[in-house]
């Protein structure tokens, strides 16, 4: 019997096979770090008198607590300022490369690494952050870990893990016009639920996936965690190789040829068997938007807020009742009748260059609706910001009435100055719509950059086709 992509990468990094139910020991190729989950890990090393085993396989950036305006001024939030200064000290003390605020390579941790060519097929990648799964778009095994595990990886460059189950999600056929990667992953989560991938590595397959760009593939793998999975992966191909070629940390010359030769072996065998398999017809999809307070509570944009009574499962019914009340909606309300206050385009899910190009192409020649209080456009990395400005995208956003910001996590989460207030409603290209995610009492609808941009023009949730 053949093996899956995930099983191949796992086997290539196996240091020691666990016995009698014990976990396997895996070698870790790359660890990414940021200011929130690293302080205790560094302190653990310091107290034990240890040094990182392979400091050249660690890299850090500042993203979660960073302001996206006035970055040259002192951070007004004492806790955020402390976390950032602590990361800077720790990286200096232990010799870890840091891309700080204002650095040309700084960005959201899961956006700056791919742009630099650090993320490569067949790697094992970890970070103290749940959306590490983003890097699986390259055919890497990328896993979010806890702070104690961060310390363990720094000290040993290994990680103890029990093998994950495997799951195939097949997106067959061609996507209808206007349907994007964000719509695909929201549709998947709506279908299988936020626990549908629990304990599994999801491999995204099918013709629709093969035709996606790398930016789009990263969007899908990014939200594997919202489906409950430990990781998400897409087999590398010519699209992957073309994206990586010439990037700062990509192999060159003969090493490039050898790397591509290996990368081409990273695909699931025809006779491999997955533990679970789901198939979705791409032609049945349309833009998706969430109505509730978890990413699985999503519907087609042409749909309505569901009636809780329509859920057979008591837990789901109760969750729907609570979500509808929190979101200030009513069952049967058309999604396209929901007016929003704020539009956020950014995050490690949808703050890449392709996302910004899509948003700009829709906003060009328009101005934000009168009821829209603010539109924040936040590139996911400084390199993306620079390229967007070279293409003149920033001018389009500013003419539209949007705020063009510096790179950072921004309004994806309420840990920096870009917060919402109670009962403020946003349409957001980020990955989570939990209660209070974007600020205490905030109400979040997840959507694609295309839907977010169109909504900013009309003032109510809509797709570009509705304009």
Swiss-Prot record:
User: Which pathway does the record list?
Assistant: Amino-acid biosynthesis; L-leucine biosynthesis; L-leucine from 3-methyl-2-oxobutanoate: step 2/4
EC number of this enzyme: 4.2.1.33
Annotated PROSITE patterns: ACONITASE_1 (PS00450), ACONITASE_2 (PS01244)
Q: Which UniProt keywords apply?
A: 4Fe-4S, Amino-acid biosynthesis, Branched-chain amino acid biosynthesis, Iron, Iron-sulfur, Leucine biosynthesis, Lyase, Metal-binding
Annotated signal sequence range = none
PANTHER family recorded for this chain? Answer: 3-ISOPROPYLMALATE DEHYDRATASE, HOMOACONITASE, MITOCHONDRIAL-RELATED
The enzyme's main class, written as a single word, is lyase
| Similarity annotation | Belongs to the aconitase/IPM isomerase family. LeuC type 1 subfamily.
Lyase is among the record's keywords: yes
Please give the InterPro entries that the UniProt record associates with this protein: 3-IsopropMal_deHydase_lsu, Acnase/IPM_dHydase_lsu_aba_1/3, Acoase/IPM_deHydtase_lsu_aba, Aconitase_4Fe-4S_BS, Aconitase_4Fe-4S_dom, IPM_dehydratase_rel_enz, IPMI_cat
Q: What Pfam families does the database record attribute to this sequence?
A: Aconitase
SUPFAM superfamilies in the cross-refs? Aconitase iron-sulfur domain (SSF53732)
Q: What domain of life does the native source organism fall in? A: Bacteria
Assembly and partners? Heterodimer of LeuC and LeuD.
Q: Which gene encodes it?
A: leuC
Keyword ATP-binding appears in the UniProt entry: no
GO MF entries: 3-isopropylmalate dehydratase activity; 4 iron, 4 sulfur cluster binding; metal ion binding
Bound cofactor: record note: Binds 1 [4Fe-4S] cluster per subunit.
Q: What does this protein do?
A: Catalyzes the isomerization between 2-isopropylmalate and 3-isopropylmalate, via the formation of 2-isopropylmaleate.
Required co-factor(s) are: [4Fe-4S] cluster
What reactions does this protein catalyze?
A: (2R,3S)-3-isopropylmalate = (2S)-2-isopropylmalate
**Name this polypeptide is given:** 3-isopropylmalate dehydratase large subunit
Which residues does [4Fe-4S] cluster bind? Answer: 348, 409, 412
Q: Which GO terms describe its biological process?
A: L-leucine biosynthetic process
């Amino acid at each position: 019997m053949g093996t899956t992509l995930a099983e191949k990468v796992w086997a290539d990094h196996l240091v020691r096979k666990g016995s009698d139910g014990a976990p396997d020991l895996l070698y870790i190729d790359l660890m990414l770090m940021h200011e929130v989950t690293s302080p205790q890990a560094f302190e653990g090393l310091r107290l034990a008198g240890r040094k990182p085993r392979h400091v050249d396989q660690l890299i850090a950036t500042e993203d979660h607590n960073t302001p996206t305006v006035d970055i040259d001024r002192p951070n007004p939030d004492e806790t955020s300022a402390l976390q950032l200064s602590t990361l800077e000290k720790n990286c200096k003390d232990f010799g870890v490369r840091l891309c700080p605020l204002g650095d040309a390579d700084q960005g959201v941790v899961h956006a700056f690494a791919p742009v630099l060519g650090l993320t490569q097929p067949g790697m094992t990648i970890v970070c103290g952050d749940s959306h590490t799964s983003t890097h699986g778009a390259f055919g890497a095994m990328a896993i979010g870990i806890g702070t104690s595990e961060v310390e363990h990886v720094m000290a040993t460059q290994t990680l103890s893990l029990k093998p994950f189950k495997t799951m195939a999600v097949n997106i067959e056929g061609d996507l209808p016009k206007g349907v994007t990667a964000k719509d695909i992953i929201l549709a998947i989560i709506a279908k299988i639920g936020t626990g549908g991938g629990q304990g599994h590595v999801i491999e995204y397959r099918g013709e629709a996936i093969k035709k996606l760009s790398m930016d789009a593939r990263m969007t899908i793998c990014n939200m594997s965690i919202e489906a409950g999975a430990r990781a998400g992966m897409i087999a590398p191909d010519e699209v992957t190789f073309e994206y990586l070629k010439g990037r700062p940390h990509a192999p060159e010359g003969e090493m490039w040829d050898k790397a591509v030769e290996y990368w081409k072996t990273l695909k699931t065998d025809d006779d491999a068997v997955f533990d679970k398999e789901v198939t979705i017809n791409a032609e049945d999809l349309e833009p998706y938007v969430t109505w509730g307070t978890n990413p699985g509570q999503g519907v087609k944009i042409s749909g309505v807020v569901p009636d809780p009574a329509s859920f057979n499962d008591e837990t789901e019914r109760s969750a729907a009742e609570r979500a509808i009340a929190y979101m200030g909606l009513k069952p049967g309300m058309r999604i396209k009748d929901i007016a929003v206050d704020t539009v956020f385009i950014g995050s490690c899910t949808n703050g890449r260059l392709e996302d910004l190009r899509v948003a700009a192409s829709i906003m060009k020649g328009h101005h934000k609706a009168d009821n829209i209080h603010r539109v924040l456009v936040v590139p996911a990395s400084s390199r993306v910001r620079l390229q967007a400005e070279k293409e003149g995208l920033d001018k389009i956003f500013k003419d539209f009435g949007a705020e063009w910001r510096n790179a950072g996590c921004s309004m994806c989460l309420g840990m920096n100055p870009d917060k919402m207030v109670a009962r403020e409603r946003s349409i957001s290209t980020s990955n989570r719509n939990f209660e209070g995610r974007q600020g205490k009492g905030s109400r979040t609808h997840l959507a694609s950059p295309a839907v977010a941009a169109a909504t900013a023009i009309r003032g109510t949730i809509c797709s570009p086709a509705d304009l």
